């Protein structure tokens, strides 16, 4: 069984960061080692919250503890999400390097959270670190549309421009770019677009877009987690992309149908493992 170290925020109530990522990856057959960068009562969109961030040095100490018992060499991948400060981002880099030193076959997937995540906004300097440092280290990245524009340093309005931006990013280091949410001026307003790009291929997929009164938090964290889990279990990029598209849709639909604000992860757990509705991805020649 594969093991992933997941470095993200955490909420006690609800689903965001590791609280949205850990269970779906486990449901897909992956052992998850959660390292919480932030511990909050709930995500901040509620308007009231309690909690705090973990010290960056403590992050490294915790991973050193795993290494001390001889377990770090069994880590097959690192997934990072919200990193709240430049010291936390630097700690994540050192952790990835430690994992790869122990297991040269381990890979790193970076969800480059640069904007507001569950009401939390990273400190100044994190965005610059993500843009300048992370692409050279990451084996894969999963920006949303806004984050892709920041990484590429350009405005993106079409699928062709997005593919071009992803390929430019790939030339800096990553092998795979998963665009969790792509705005395309040519797409219907009721469709949600995702894009997966490698050096030689690109796939686009669409799922229904639901009109929530308040959009649930954690969908991006869920998306990255499912994609990483599918890749870890051996799925091809396209198969992982299609499974992610279908599984995330199932969770979002279950949440919408239940009229809930928090993601219905437990209710939709069978759909995460075996989605009943598939949308398929098609190759884009953009």
Swiss-Prot record:
Transmembrane segments: none annotated. Pathway: Cofactor metabolism; pyridoxal 5'-phosphate salvage; pyridoxal 5'-phosphate from pyridoxal: step 1/1. GO terms for biological process: pyridoxal 5'-phosphate salvage. InterPro entries: PM/HMP-P_kinase-1, PyrdxlKinase, Pyridoxal_kinase_PdxY, Ribokinase-like. GO terms for molecular function: ATP binding; magnesium ion binding; pyridoxal kinase activity. Its EC number is 2.7.1.35. It holds the Pfam family Phos_pyr_kin. Its cofactor is Mg(2+). One of its GO terms (cellular component) is cytosol. Substrate binds at residues 9, 44-45, 221. ATP binds at residues 111, 147, 180. Homodimer. Belongs to the pyridoxine kinase family. PdxY subfamily. This is Pyridoxal kinase PdxY. It comes from Burkholderia lata (strain ATCC 17760 / DSM 23089 / LMG 22485 / NCIMB 9086 / R18194 / 383). The lineage of its organism: Bacteria, Pseudomonadati, Pseudomonadota, Betaproteobacteria, Burkholderiales.
């Amino acid at each position: 069984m594969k093991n992933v170290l997941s470095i993200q925020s955490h909420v006690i109530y609800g689903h965001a960061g590791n609280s949205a990522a850990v269970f779906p990856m486990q449901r897909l057959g992956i052992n998850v080692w959660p390292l919480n960068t932030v511990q909050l009562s709930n995500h901040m969109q509620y308007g009231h919250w309690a909690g705090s961030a973990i010290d960056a040095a403590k992050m490294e100490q915790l991973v050193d503890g795993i290494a001390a018992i001889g377990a770090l060499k069994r880590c097959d991948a690192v997934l990072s999400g919200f990193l709240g400060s430049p010291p936390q981002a630097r700690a994540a880099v050192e952790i990835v390097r430690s994992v790869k030193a122990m297991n040269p076959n381990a890979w790193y997937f970076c969800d480059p959270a640069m904007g507001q995540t569950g009401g939390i906004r990273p400190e100044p300097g994190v965005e610059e670190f993500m843009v300048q440092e992370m692409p050279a280290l990451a084996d894969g990245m999963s920006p949303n549309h806004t984050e892709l524009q920041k990484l590429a340093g350009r405005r993106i309005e079409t699928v062709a421009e997005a593919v071009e931006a992803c390929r430019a990013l790939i030339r800096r280091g990553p092998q795979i770019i998963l665009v969790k949410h792509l705005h395309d001026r040519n797409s219907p307003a009721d469709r949600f677009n995702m894009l997966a790009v490698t050096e030689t291929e690109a796939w686009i997929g669409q799922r229904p877009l639901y009109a929530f009164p308040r959009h649930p938090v954690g969908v991006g964290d869920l998306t990255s987690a499912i994609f990483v889990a599918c890749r870890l279990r051996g799925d091809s990029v396209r198969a992982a992309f299609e499974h992610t598209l279908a599984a995330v849709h199932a969770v979002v639909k279950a949440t919408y149908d239940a009229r809930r604000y928090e993601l219905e992860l437990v209710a939709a757990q069978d759909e995460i493992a075996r989605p009943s509705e598939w949308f398929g991805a098609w190759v884009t020649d953009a």
